[in-house]
Amino acid sequence: MDFSYSSYEKLISLLKQYNYSITDYNNYKKYEKSVILRHDIDFSIKDSYKFSLFEESLGIKSNYFVLLSTGFYNPMEKRVRKILRDMHNRGFTIGLHFDTTAYDNTDLNKPIQSEKHILEEILEAPVNLIAFHRPAPTVLANNLKFPGLINVYSKEFFHDCKYCSDSRFFWRDNPYELITSQKYDRLQILTHAFCWAESDRCPAHVYKSFISQASWERYKYLTENIRNPEEFISEEEARKLWLNK
């Protein structure tokens, strides 16, 4: 299975063909066979927003998890807030993607509740889901519970459901085969919109393009925040930096 939109569309078609109901973490038990589609926003809000529009064109809704402590995007930025609210208003579920390594304290509940509150302020809506970012084995083993939040790495969703992920452009289980095998009535499929595009791409190229794009985005933000930026750097110079020329 590659990382093209057409491959994802085939995934959705197979799920429907084999009678899986596409649902969420609150309602999956209502169905004889159910699948939860999850997306962790590790790198790019834009890619995730584009992917949500693609999913909407397929007639489905899924679950997106926002990483507040990332250095790659700012959930508080006006444009990002607008995107997240739009996704929520269009029926996509937004949850908290929490990085345990961002905090020194062993009691995680306080920073988790703080980030939950921030995300609720951004969305202007309640948040009741948490997915850990690159969870340590101890986090997975302890079946952690937090007030007001469903831990999607709890035993209920990580062991009782068949879990499948595309982490680092690599499927540890082929999702097509999981579906067609008919061995599992409960699936949780994690994908990262950053990996997906209209056509399949070399992972190294994706990461290099992502790094290169950052220089152009910095220039655009610069033009919005200082007067006469061309006194220091022209658009042509910025474009050359972006294109690595």
Task: Please name every model-derived segment.
Residues 93:
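Short HxH-centered metal-ligating active-site micro-motif
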Residues 1-63, 67-79, 85-90, 101, ...:
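Terminal accessory/targeting
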